[in-house]
Structure formats: structure tokens, C-alpha cells
Amino acid sequence: MDINKARKAKFDELNSGKNLEISRAIEALGDLECACEFSDTINIKFQNLSAEKKEEIYALAKSLKPWRKGPFKIDDIFIDTEWQSFIKFNLLAPHLNLDGKSVADVGCNNGYYMFRMLNFAPKKITGFDPSVHTALQFKFINHFAKTNIAYEMLGVEHLPFFESKFDTIFCLGVIYHRSDPIKMLKELKSALNPGGEVFLDTMYIDMRGEFALSPKNTYSKIPNIYFVPTIDALQGWCERAKFKDFEILATKQTDTSEQRKTPWIDGQSLQNFLDPNDNTKTIEGYPAPKRVYVKIKI
């Protein structure tokens, strides 16, 4: 696979039409002196931000809707994202040892988790996500944060051909979007250095047995959900991909304290995806979303 060809296609998409307009508007903000705090809310603070510049920043942030992962605060502009992503990150944080490591975040969205990882002193962080929209969101936030995080508009399928390998890979909320989950796990494994580890999460079916739900059309109104496994099935997938040391870190029911509609997204959110008369079921009648967080090694 020619990943440079894939890069060029995404670069061309980034540099055309509205995407190019937004990219240039971000660059036109200029070099603004600020301080950044990478806590539950990514907080960007300014000493003397003019009202005119603040209005530019607000307009740009609005043009980048919908905002899924976060939240972010830029001066007094609070980007109240659909997901309270700190809930997931704080579940994982006690298990992280990233000091001096080369880290990848596969399906990194706008970079929220990568910004949080900076507090753990990794050697290098590289994000992978083919979405030009979220790449622009990252560019917007990183314009102020000025980090050395690298953002590749590539997918998990490009990992076996990437120029370098990683000590730790995060792959959060991706595997159920792949029609061949075992192949995806093998792609993750191919990108690891010896002794490497993967932090993985997925929606799961809270039952015993080695099977997976394969929704006919949608799951929680999401069309590209292929398999929602039991934990036993997930462990089997990982073992087939030649991972070892399958460790369950946490499980959690997804609720409206974590995922909800805000003015910073368009369309619907979790409250619209569940049965209005029984929130233990999705609108389609499947078990409502629960997530399991695991660590696997090679």
C-alpha cells in the first residue's frame, strides 16, 4: 500500500474549498501568546486577548462543528463537546506508563486524548485519523497549544506501512467500525515495537460466551457498527491476532453524563439513540451501549 498516495489525497482534500478557507483562517490568527493546561478541560489562557481576536476565534470554533471529543476552553469560550472525554481518559490514566515512549493514537479525532497524554512525558505522540474535519479541529487547538504532536490523516489500515513503530498504541472506539476486527488487531500488532502494548476499548455485550452482535442495519442509530462482541469474544479476537496478557481495566455503561447533545454538535446524541421507554435498550431493541477497556501486549 502506498501511504504517500493516501497522504496526498487527504492533503488535496485539506487544501480545497471550505477546508482551505478554514485552514488559512487558523493560520491568519497569528502567533498568540498563551498558556495551556492539559487537564479534564483543555484550557488555553491568554494575557491580553482583544475582543476582535476573541470573536475571530469563536467564529472559527463554530465553523468547525460538530465537536465530538473534549471539552476545550479558549479564553472564556467553552467548547462543550458531545463527549465528556475525560471520563474515558481518567479510567485509563492509572494504567499508563508513557515516559519516554513512542505513542500512537489510532482514531485520534481532534487530539483531545493526545493533549492529555503530554502530562505523561512520552518521547513522541502521533495521531492517526483519516477525517479532514477532525484534522482541522486539531490544527485549530494546536495553533494555540504549539505541541510537537504529529497528526497523520491515515487509518488503521495504513499502520503496517508506516515509517516507524510504537511502544504504546491507543485505539479507542474504533474496532466496532471495522468489518474485519481480527485484521484490524493484526494491523495494530504490526505497528508495535517488541514488548509493545495496546489500550483498546469497544462497546460490548454484557453476556458470557464467545459471540458478537452483528446489527442488521444500525446500532444506536449508527450505521457503520459491524460487530459488538462479548468480552469473551474480544479476548478470542485478540488471541487470534497473537496478542497476549489480555487485561480488563474497566467496564462502564455509557450514559448521558458522558455523551449528550450540546450546542457544539449538530443532530442527535445518546438520548435519541436509546429506547424512550427503556434506557437499557437501544432504539433498535439491542442492549444499550456498554464499554470495556482492555490492555493487550505482544
Swiss-Prot record:
Gene Ontology terms: biological process: tRNA wobble uridine modification
Record-linked SUPFAM superfamilies: S-adenosyl-L-methionine-dependent methyltransferases
Catalytic class of the enzyme: transferase
Gene3D superfamilies: Vaccinia Virus protein VP39
Pfam families: Methyltransf_9
Superkingdom field: Bacteria
Keyword Transferase tagged: yes
EC number assigned by the record: 2.5.1.-
InterPro entries: CmoB, Mo5U34_MeTrfas-like, SAM-dependent_MTases_sf
Any one GO molecular function term: methyltransferase activity
Keywords: Transferase, tRNA processing
Binding residues for carboxy-S-adenosyl-L-methionine: K69, W83, K88, G107, D129, P130, S131, V156, E157, Y176, R291
Oligomer status and interactors: Homotetramer.
Described purpose of this protein according to its UniProt entry: Catalyzes carboxymethyl transfer from carboxy-S-adenosyl-L-methionine (Cx-SAM) to 5-hydroxyuridine (ho5U) to form 5-carboxymethoxyuridine (cmo5U) at position 34 in tRNAs.
Family, per entry: Belongs to the class I-like SAM-binding methyltransferase superfamily. CmoB family.
Name of the molecule in the record: tRNA U34 carboxymethyltransferase
Origin organism lineage: Bacteria, Pseudomonadati, Campylobacterota, Epsilonproteobacteria, Campylobacterales
